[in-house]
Regions:
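Acidic, divalent-metal-binding catalytic cores of TOPRIM
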Residues: 1-164
C-alpha cells in the first residue's frame, strides 16, 4: 500500500467513489492524457460515448509537475492503476506500427485501458486535406476559400511520393 494519496489513486479507488453516489448517478471515468492540447481532442471524442450511465473527466496526470508525454501517463505511476474507471489516452506515435517491438508498444497494444490514436498523433487527425480549410478558418476567422487544399495535397503527394 502506498504512503501517499496519489499512490493509491487507482481505477478501484474511482470505482469505490462512484459506489458512494446515488444508485442512478452516472459513473465517472477518469481519462488521463499527455498534454494540454490533447484534452480538447479526447474530450470531444469521448463525449460521444457518454450517456445516462457514464461520463468522462479528461485531465492531465499531474497538476503540479510539467511532465508531459506518454511516459508520464503510462509508465510512471498510472500504468498499473488503470482499469474500467481510469483510462489513459495517448498518441500512438510509432507504437501501433511497431506492434510490440518496444516495451511501450507492447504495453499500449496489450492494455485494454489504454486508448491511442491509430495515426502518429492527434495533429494527423486535425490536419488532413479535407479539414485544412476548417483549420484555416479557426486560425484566421476568415471563411473565404483561397486554396483548394484537397487538390493541392493530392498534387503535392503525387510529386513527393516517388522521392520516398
Amino acid at each position: 500500500m502506498g504512503k501517499r494519496l496519489s499512490e493509491n489513486l487507482s481505477s478501484l479507488y474511482i470505482g469505490a467513489a462512484n459506489k458512494l453516489k446515488p444508485r442512478r448517478s452516472r459513473r465517472k471515468i477518469i481519462a488521463y492524457v499527455e498534454s494540454y492540447d490533447d484534452i480538447s481532442f479526447w474530450r470531444t471524442l469521448l463525449s460521444e460515448y457518454e450517456d445516462e450511465t457514464r461520463y468522462f473527466e479528461v485531465m492531465l496526470p499531474s497538476k503540479t509537475t510539467l511532465a508531459k508525454g506518454k511516459k508520464s501517463v503510462l509508465m510512471n505511476e498510472l500504468g498499473p492503476q488503470l482499469g474500467q474507471n481510469m483510462i489513459a489516452c495517448v498518441d500512438s506515435d510509432y507504437d501501433y506500427l511497431l506492434q510490440g517491438a518496444t516495451h511501450t508498444s507492447r504495453y499500449i497494444i496489450n492494455n485494454k485501458y489504454v486508448f491511442h490514436t491509430y495515426a502518429y498523433a492527434i495533429e494527423n487527425y486535425q490536419c488532413y486535406a479535407e479539414a485544412l480549410h476548417e483549420v484555416c478558418v479557426m486560425a484566421t476567422l476568415n471563411d473565404h476559400p483561397l486554396i483548394d487544399f484537397v487538390a493541392f495535397m493530392r498534387m503535392y503527394s503525387q510529386i513527393a511520393y516517388p522521392l520516398f
